[in-house]
């Protein structure tokens, strides 16, 4: 799995994706000195209330597409493939909770990647999923919205914390931040979803969390 190809961008304003292996993303988070410098400066400027300077550092950090691969852009029309990955974002966690949340998500067998976000107060999670019953006519964008909701509800229950629902779009990018303790599990267990059951479950669902395995 470490050779899975992903689309990475030099920064949030970049529109030309570069294909890299998943293990290169992990290496950047763990070892890249330029990313470490941006992360340190962002946290310093933010602590001093210098929002513009902090935003400049964040915008300069690389970011990668979690759910899809892109070609020649980063719009929905530029999607060239699907990774089988989804994202959970726990940002601005209550004081002292980030370490606890990180430990819980790292211990879960579904977690492929977990790292502390650039704020230093959040945790980003990447996990795998499989779709049973998929056909060439399957609407992958609609399916991803369903997958995202179920996966995020699962991790929300696991941690007892709120997730960011704004990350539901398949084209959403995940910004990198330096984390020497980044967690990576090559053989992570995928969530499995049956497409027909998932569609049927959507209509009657009203605040009920569906069990996923």
Which functions belong to the PLM regions below?
Residues 1-84, 200, 204-212:
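DNA replication initiation on ssDNA origins
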Residues 2-16, 73-96, 130-213:
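DNA replication initiation modules
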Residues 21-29, 100-103, 186-193:
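Short, polar loop/linker segments at the starts of domains and inter-domain junctions
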Residues 42-52, 105-109, 151-159:
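Hydrophobic, Leu/Ile/Phe/Ala-enriched alpha-helical segments that form helix-helix packing faces
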Residues 77-80, 104-106, 114-116:
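Short, charge-rich binding segments
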Residues 95-111:
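Short amphipathic alpha-helix segments
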Residues 113-119, 164-169:
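Short beta-strand
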Residues 117-128:
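Short, conserved phosphate-binding/catalytic loop or strand-edge motifs used
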């Amino acid at each position: 799995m470490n050779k899975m190809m992903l689309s990475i961008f030099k920064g949030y304003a970049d529109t030309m994706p570069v294909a890299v292996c998943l293990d290169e993303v992990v290496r950047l988070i763990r070892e890249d000195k330029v990313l470490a410098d941006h992360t340190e400066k962002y946290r310093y400027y933010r602590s001093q209330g210098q929002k513009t300077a902090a935003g400049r550092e964040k915008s300069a950090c690389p970011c990668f597409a979690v759910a899809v691969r892109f070609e020649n852009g980063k719009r929905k029309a530029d999607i060239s493939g699907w990774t089988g990955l989804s994202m959970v974002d726990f940002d601005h966690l209550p004081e002292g909770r980030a370490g606890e949340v990180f430990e819980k998500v790292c211990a879960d067998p579904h977690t492929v990647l977990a790292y502390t976000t650039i704020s230093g107060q959040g945790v980003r999670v990447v996990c795998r999923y499989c779709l049973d019953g998929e056909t060439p006519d399957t609407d992958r964008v609609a399916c991803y919205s369903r997958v995202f909701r179920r996966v995020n509800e699962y991790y929300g229950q696991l941690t007892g914390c709120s997730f960011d629902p704004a990350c539901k779009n398949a084209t959403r990018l995940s910004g990198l931040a330096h984390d020497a303790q980044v967690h990576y599990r090559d053989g992570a267990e995928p969530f499995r979803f049956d497409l027909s059951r998932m569609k049927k479950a959507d209509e009657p669902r009203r605040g009920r969390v569906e069990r996923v395995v």
